Amino acid sequence: VSVLTEPDAFAGDLAHVAEVSAALPGMAVMRKDFLVGTYQVLEARAAGASGVLLIAAMLNDAQLQDMLRYAHRLGLFALVEIFAADDLERSVSAIRAAGPAIVDGRCRSLLGVNCRDLRSLKVDFGRFADLAPRLPADIPRVAESGVESASQAARVAGLGYGLALVGT
């Protein structure tokens, strides 16, 4: 379950993570926000999250690696989100530097492709197909944004995405 915590644009709140975690014990709950530092990762853990979203375009290489490793140290998974091919190589490098993406059958790191341009907010569903051949097979793939129907979910699954974020 992805829980928006960004208050200004999305009316989110960190308390929502705690509420959802309490209501759905055993369910993976991810903090979805514009995280820029390890303290926000710690906040997510303290609120009961089991994972965090890390947007590669918002982070330099050192921040991305630090936040990814810190999330893992806290026992959290990290969904590293890319929008453009520019962020693919450095995101994969950061994920690999943090250790195996899957340990004991549990995802520690996932690689997400967001087909919504964060600047214009326009959705380009074709981005999933464009980037799919370049995504490594050993890191779980997530299709983010633009998936609004079962047929679209089937399309991204056919491209090799094992997971999808549906909704805002």
Task: Locate each region found by the language model.
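Catalytic-face loop-and-helix region of soluble metabolic enzyme cores
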Residues: D104-V166
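Conserved alpha/beta-domain cores
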Residues: V92-G99, D104, R119-S120
